[in-house]
Amino acid sequence: MESTITIENVVASTALATEFDLVKIMDSGLEGAEYNKTKFPGLVYRIDNPKAAFLIFTSGKVVCTGAKTINNAHKAITNLANKLKDIGCDKINLEPEIHVQNIVASADLKTTLNLNTIAIAFGLENVEYEPEVFPGLIYRVEAPKVVVLVFSSGKLVITGGKCEEDCNGGLRIVRKEFDNLGLLC
């Protein structure tokens, strides 16, 4: 049975302005915003539709995290840009260039795995497995450049992709490698 990925998190960044006055943004009554520069240099702002969280910095740069799709990350950033304009922020870029920094996806191979066997079969080149430190096997895929965390339950976490196809490619490679080793039913 073919496994499919589920996107769990998309992290994207952009520049919405050349600078932000974070205190002014807080004072404008941006509902749900948190800013304490002694704890963190950015303002944290969360929205529900689409669900996402933002880190907003004085440099005008913004990081969006928590979106479940690339499209939702774009929508969330566009909504934020309009909200910042509405509360009086100057020179907001309403059509910013958005860069996906990381996609985290999950998958289930629907079989249990012996991670010791996999670690021995793969050697030390692209694999790390230290069960005393971390219960998963870390498999670094060269192309696409992703990291796949493999758990004995057969569950996978794929991280480092810049697009959905990177994550799918990582899953295909892992499935093929495990199938070649006779590990998949």
Swiss-Prot record:
Q: Which SUPFAM superfamilies match?
A: TATA-box binding protein-like
User: Which organism's genome codes for this protein?
Assistant: Methanosarcina acetivorans (strain ATCC 35395 / DSM 2834 / JCM 12185 / C2A)
NCBIfam families (alphabetical)? PRK00394.1-2, PRK00394.2-4
The question of whether Transcription regulation is a record keyword is answered with yes
User: What does this protein do, in the record's words?
Assistant: General factor that plays a role in the activation of archaeal genes transcribed by RNA polymerase. Binds specifically to the TATA box promoter element which lies close to the position of transcription initiation.
Q: Which UniProt keywords apply?
A: DNA-binding, Repeat, Transcription, Transcription regulation
Where do the TM regions start and end? none
This entry's Gene Ontology molecular function terms read: DNA binding; DNA-binding transcription factor activity; general transcription initiation factor activity
Name the PROSITE patterns for this protein.
Answer: TFIID
Name its GO BP terms in alphabetical order: DNA-templated transcription initiation
Give the superkingdom in one word: Archaea
Cite the Pfam families for this sequence.
TBP
Protein name in UniProt: TATA-box-binding protein 3
Q: Where are the sequence repeats?
A: 7-84, 100-178
**Which family does the record claim for this protein?**
Belongs to the TBP family.
Which InterPro entries would you find in this protein's record? TBP (IPR000814), TBP_CS (IPR030491), TBP_dom_sf (IPR012295)
The gene designation is: tbp3
